[in-house]
């Protein structure tokens, strides 16, 4: 059986913390690597749940003569992927009021395939409760980021209310249990190597960023995975489903009882092979032949399975979009079905945005990316999170039309999911207005094609006459 007990609340690790001003030494790093190794038991368990390697496969074997089905339903993956698709199925939009800043953001995002990067960060955060991103420079001095799961990385914070990061460690173990990695501090990056029992510091280089280039993306303050609260329910569901399958096998292997006569092995063989019973007892004895009935607990089992299924989605707060009644729902009723998951997504929005601000702060801190006087431009970046769900465009259009009479056009356009970039849309609207204005005549009417041609012909004639007059002179 596994070491991690998901039901035990004490098994959920707390963030690593040290007093402010603590010196980062080899001993300190080794101490926290040892603590992190303990946390990896939980991480491995959660990834096993996501990959559908659940506890039902670790239950004791039954006797050989009993059916022993092991069925596991992929609830953890379904819950995670459904929520990530809802939260980040539509990529996060970033917008700044200055076009030069927008161009830098777009270039950085394109170079790093940021849509996939952020999707993986969200997925890992939903599985483990948090994930990490490391920023680095390539050989051409271009800034890059890569996601890292928490089995290979951790951050140590100070004990202040602000929880400022003191140092971060990224390390990997090879097949020979040797450890290689890097320690990141405010001022330097230190290579480490050794083994889990102890690592030593190697080469050092200056940290060129304005802060530790390791960013933590958290799902919630407790850093619990999105399906972690229903682990016990998932295990119970798998066990109940497996027992249900065992019962089906039991009924398929029902016993045939023959009373009132003696049945030899040869008789039993003929009954089995010929599927015919011609029985008579001595001296007119009463013979009874029937299958033994087993207790039927089907209704009880189905009630348990139905209850567990509903509780898994209710407690995880993720909508069961595979429900038959879900597809027939629309409008306000559909929004109510998404309400719990929407609340969860909004809470994740705030955590995710905080990490994104830290990412672009580090990006803008390098003069190779942004002039020093504009290093604070990251503070004005506007992040737009949109939910990936069925859209009623007619209702949105009506709401936007009504809102436009009360607010600015920009505010009204934000209601429309079909508009991905509001400032760009406003620019296109203005261009169309200018183009339309040019097609009006001085009295406010439109030129028709013949009028435009006549006007062009008249202008050409006047030009020719003026030219001829000048030549005659």
Please provide the spans of the model-predicted regions.
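Extended, helix-rich architectural segments
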Residues: 1-144, 465-473
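Structured loops at beta-to-helix junctions and adjacent beta-edge loops in soluble globular domains
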Residues: 136, 170-172, 240, 292-295, ...
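Extended, charged amphipathic alpha-helical segments
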Residues: 200-336
């Amino acid at each position: 059986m596994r070491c991690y007990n998901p039901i035990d609340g004490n098994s959920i690790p707390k963030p690593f913390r040290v007093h402010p001003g603590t010196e980062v030494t080899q001993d300190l790093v080794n101490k926290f690597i040892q603590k992190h190794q303990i946390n990896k038991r939980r991480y491995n368990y959660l990834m096993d749940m996501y990959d559908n390697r659940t506890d039902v496969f670790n239950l004791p074997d039954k006797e050989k003569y009993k059916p022993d089905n092991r069925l596991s339903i992929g609830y953890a993956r379904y819950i995670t992927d459904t929520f990530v698709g809802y939260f980040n199925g539509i990529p996060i939009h970033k917008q700044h009021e200055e076009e030069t800043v927008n161009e830098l953001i777009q270039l950085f995002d394109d170079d790093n395939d940021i849509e996939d990067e952020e999707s993986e960060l969200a997925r890992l955060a939903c599985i483990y409760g948090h994930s990490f991103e490391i920023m680095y420079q390539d050989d051409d001095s271009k800034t890059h980021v890569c996601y890292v799961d928490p089995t290979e990385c951790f951050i140590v914070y100070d004990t202040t209310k602000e929880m400022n990061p003191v140092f971060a460690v990224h390390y990997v173990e090879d097949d020979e249990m040797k450890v290689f990695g890097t320690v990141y501090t405010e001022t330097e990056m230190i290579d480490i190597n050794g083994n889990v029992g102890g690592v030593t510091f190697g080469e050092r280089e200056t940290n060129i960023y304005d802060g530790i280039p390791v960013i933590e993306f958290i799902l919630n303050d407790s850093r619990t995975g999105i399906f972690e609260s229903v682990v016990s329910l998932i295990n119970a569901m798998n066990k109940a489903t497996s027992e249900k399958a065992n019962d089906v096998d039991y009924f398929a292997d029902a016993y045939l009882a023959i009373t009132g006569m003696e049945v030899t092995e040869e008789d039993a063989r003929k009954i089995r092979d010929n599927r015919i019973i011609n029985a008579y007892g001595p001296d007119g004895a009463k013979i009874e032949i029937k299958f033994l009935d087993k207790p039927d607990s089907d209704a009880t089992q189905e009630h348990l399975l139905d209850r567990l299924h509903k509780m898994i989605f209710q407690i995880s707060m993720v909508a069961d979009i595979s429900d038959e009644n879900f597809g027939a729902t629309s409008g306000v009723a559909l929004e109510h079905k998404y309400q719990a998951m929407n609340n969860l997504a909004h809470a994740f929005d705030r955590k995710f945005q905080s990490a994104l601000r830290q990412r672009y702060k580090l990006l803008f801190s390098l003069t190779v990316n942004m002039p020093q006087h504009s290093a604070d431009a990251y503070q004005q970046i506007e992040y737009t999170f949109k939910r990936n769900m069925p859209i009623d465009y007619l209702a949105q259009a009506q709401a936007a039309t009504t809102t436009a009479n009360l607010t600015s056009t920009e505010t009204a356009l934000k209601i429309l999911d079909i508009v991905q970039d509001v400032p760009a849309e406003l620019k296109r609207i203005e261009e169309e207005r200018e183009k339309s204005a040019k097609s009006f005549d001085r009295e406010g009417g439109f030129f028709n094609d013949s009028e435009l041609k006549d006007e062009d012909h008249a202008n050409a004639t006047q030009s020719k006459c003026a030219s001829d007059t000048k030549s005659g002179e």
